[in-house]
């Protein structure tokens, strides 16, 4: 049902034109909005509800300001036509959406999500790391296995002619190294591969000097030390190094093929005492 039409405002005494009244004499018909039956039919239910709320609010403001006047026919019609503002008169589009939600097309997420249990405040416990053995016991399925920490290459890895990749060299274990160094020093426990190295090492503990100099009789622990020591017994006029020892007379490194051994201070202490 369409709302009542706008009332015709009769001219009052002193007005030149209808509707042109003096300031301060405002009625509800001056500020209200009226629709024709054709215009009212084009409005949606939501727009009609908004129109009702605005008109009732405007009428309430005028009453609060103390403007006199009878109750407008539009407000009376809004109060009588309660069916036009019932929940059944809804927007068709909104009604379809709400109907779809009622049918279960769009589930409610709040209903599906479980409620969170409030956690007790306190220090968090650190996660306990379990060993692979415990994980294997909990998972008896043979398909679920724990991978080893380090992938080991196959023992008999052959050379691949297609890619040309060489098999990785095996890393000797501690047991293999201990098996190679079978000669152990009884004094310090150090191990050696060859017995000659063990014999030379034991002279450090015993203080034995089995290599004497044939010219002066000075004894040394190693044979190459005797050969280096014999340089000081050479004549000062014959040898290539038979000059006064100094910076230029002694090379920094021995030359390959040189018969003279490397010169060390511990091999010729007497020369520095005699000639400086």
Swiss-Prot record:
Domain KRAB: 26-97
Chain intervals annotated as zinc finger (C2H2-type): 183-205, 211-233
Biased composition (Basic and acidic residues): 91-119, 127-140
Molecular-function annotations in GO: DNA binding; DNA-binding transcription factor activity; zinc ion binding
GO CC annotation terms, alphabetical: nucleus
The keyword Transcription regulation is assigned to this record: yes
Database matches in SMART domains: KRAB, ZnF_C2H2
Keywords, sorted A to Z: DNA-binding, Metal-binding, Nucleus, Repeat, Transcription, Transcription regulation, Zinc, Zinc-finger
The organism's place on the tree of life at top rank: Eukaryota
UniProt xrefs under Pfam families: KRAB, zf-C2H2
Segments for region (Disordered): 1-22, 80-170, 236-255
Composition-biased stretches (Pro residues): 1-10
Location(s), subcellular: Nucleus
S-adenosyl-L-methionine listed as a keyword: no
InterPro entries referenced in this protein's UniProt entry, alphabetically: KRAB, KRAB_dom_sf, Krueppel_C2H2_ZnF, Znf_C2H2_sf, Znf_C2H2_type
Assigned protein family: Belongs to the krueppel C2H2-type zinc-finger protein family.
Function, in words: May be involved in transcriptional regulation.
Protein name: Zinc finger protein 688
Species whose genome carries this gene: Homo sapiens
Gene name of the record: ZNF688
């Amino acid at each position: 049902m369409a709302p009542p039409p706008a009332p015709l405002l009769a001219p009052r005494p002193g007005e030149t034109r209808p509707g042109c009244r003096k300031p301060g004499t405002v009625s509800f018909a001056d500020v209200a909005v009226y629709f024709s039956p054709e215009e009212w039919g084009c409005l949606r239910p939501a727009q009609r509800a908004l129109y009702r709320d605005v008109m009732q609010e405007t009428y309430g403001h005028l009453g609060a300001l103390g403007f006199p006047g009878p109750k407008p026919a539009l407000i009376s019609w809004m109060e009588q036509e309660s069916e036009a503002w019932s929940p059944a008169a809804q927007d068709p589009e909104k009604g379809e959406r709400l109907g779809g939600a009622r049918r279960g097309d769009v589930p409610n997420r709040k209903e599906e999500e479980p409620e969170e249990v409030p956690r007790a405040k306190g220090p968090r416990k650190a996660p306990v790391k379990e060993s692979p053995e415990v994980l294997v016991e909990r998972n008896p399925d043979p398909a679920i296995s724990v991978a080893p920490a380090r992938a080991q290459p196959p023992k008999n890895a052959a050379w691949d002619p297609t890619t040309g990749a060489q098999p990785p060299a095996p890393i000797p274990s501690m047991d293999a190294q201990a098996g190679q160094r079978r000669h152990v020093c009884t004094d310090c426990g150090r191990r050696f591969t060859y017995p000659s190295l063990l014999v030379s090492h034991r002279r450090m503990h015993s203080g034995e000097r089995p290599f004497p100099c044939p010219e002066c009789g000075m004894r040394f622990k190693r044979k190459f030390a005797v050969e280096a020591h014999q340089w000081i017994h050479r004549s000062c006029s014959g040898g290539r190094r038979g000059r006064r020892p100094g910076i230029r007379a002694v090379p920094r490194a021995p030359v390959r093929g040189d018969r003279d051994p490397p010169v060390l201070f511990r091999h010729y202490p007497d020369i520095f005492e005699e000639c400086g």
